[in-house]
Amino acid sequence: MSKETLILLYGGRSAEREVSVLSAESVMRAVNYSRFVVKTYFITKGGEFIKTQEFTDKPAEEEKLLTNDLAESYPKISPAAIYEKAAVVFPVLHGPMGEDGSIQGFLEILRLAYVGPNILSASSTMDKLLAKHVFEAVGVPQVPYVAAFADENQGEIAQEVVEKLEFPVFVKPANMGSSVGISKVDDLADLQPALSEAYKYDNRVVIEQGVDAREIECAVLGNNSDVSATLPGEVVKDVEFYDYNSKYIDNKIQMDIPAKVPADLAQKMQEYAIKAYKAVNGTGLSRCDFFVTKDGNVYLNEINAIPGFTQWSMYPLLWENMGLSYSDLIEKLVDLAKETFETRENHLL
């Protein structure tokens, strides 16, 4: 039997391209090579596509995915040249141009099956403001927040924050993930510098009420009505808040899987995770991040439609705890991608 082709897209234009490379390398090593041939394409910061490598067997430990200057020495190709009949694409891309619906729309134009969120679920979960409106509509609790826009009167924004929230607050670009551009603000004097930092990444910003809470996450997997969520896991931090460096560079986090929470609280988070996932028409996978306060209140922080996917990332570790190995998880995601593709093709008039 001939092998299936799995195409890995990695790199990308966003500030999170380094995370993408780490995730793609983990997938490259964990793939079931008795079923798949893996072809890899690097997307440069400028958005150009480069075919880098092809693997028919598990690569040696010292073999790495080509990136940056080395990858850019290879010839650039037309983005549409990645097309291969019956191939499945795994877009291991994070942030803008990766999990905001852009690459998903491109792959649908090419009529390729792909792992992960569809256009709607990617774009709606990537936009923190839009996601908040959706979650409010289905009754999933969230912390209080204020929306800010770069072209608005910043003094009026500050006044609204003072009236509606209490310090500390967290300032977040509306369209960015992996804690890029996020600042913790302890008093009014530090609000404007934090807004200026966030506006570097997006002209729309969310200012959220800080809460004294544990950060607990559930992994979600499935399509349509057949969706399941894991027992929650907890981020245990050695830093004040979970920023980009602590996540991916400084290794200052640990994870408790499963999280030490009462069974009824774990069930509540699983129910909220599935409700939020279905509300945004989730496909494939997502990670739902919650705040849990000392008095047992649960708040959905965000849905991450393409969560970090290294072998030490929370998402695959949560499923491993449920008995689904990293390699089997990849195969399940490919099967879900093919299912979504077939459904989409059958619905075209």
UniProtKB/Swiss-Prot annotation:
Needed co-factor(s): Mg(2+); Mn(2+)
Reactions accelerated catalytically: 2 D-alanine + ATP = D-alanyl-D-alanine + ADP + phosphate + H(+)
Binding site for ATP: 162-217
Binding site residues for Mg(2+) 1: 289, 302
The keyword Lipoprotein appears for this protein: no
Positions of Mg(2+) 2 binding: 302, 304
GO CC annotation, single: cytosol
Top enzyme class: ligase
Localization: Cytoplasm
General function of this protein: Cell wall formation.
The name this protein goes by in its record: D-alanine--D-alanine ligase
Gene from which the chain derives: ddl
